[in-house]
Amino acid sequence: MARESRKMEQSGLDFVEVGQHYLFAKTVGETDVVLFAGITGDFSDTHINDQYMKEKSSLGRRIAHGALLVGYMSTVSTISIAHVIHKEGLSDFPVSAGYDRVRFLQPVLLGDTITAHYTVDVVDKERGRSIAKVKVVNQNGETVAIADHIMRWAKKLSMASS
């Protein structure tokens, strides 16, 4: 009698471990800030007006949007799951459930090079989620932003009933 071979389905969380660390680095430039302002509609002088910042700010230069830094946090969270999402036989897939305790600690100036660090802190298989500490540092090693990222491992997406 022929035996039917079946691959056991695994959770993506089986490949996520506390302490795993991922990086994303980028120099924040004019194009990043201008495109982000256009996409979001946030045309604050602090982001787009050189003269205003020279005259009114002790920084003397424009700064990146804080929400742009959250976008870079999202990039590094995507990098963190790249080794998992295309494995065969997964019973679930990752969905960002959000960021807690987001803090902008220092300004990011145009021309700064930031590195987003993503370190898995909690793997909770019972609740189907992982939590990572995210820290963004500039080229001088100064922490400019922090957050906790929650990644939910969903069996299936569904729309909320109305």
Regions found by a protein language model. Name each.
Residues 2-21, 104-162:
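HotDog/MaoC-like acyl-thioester-processing domains
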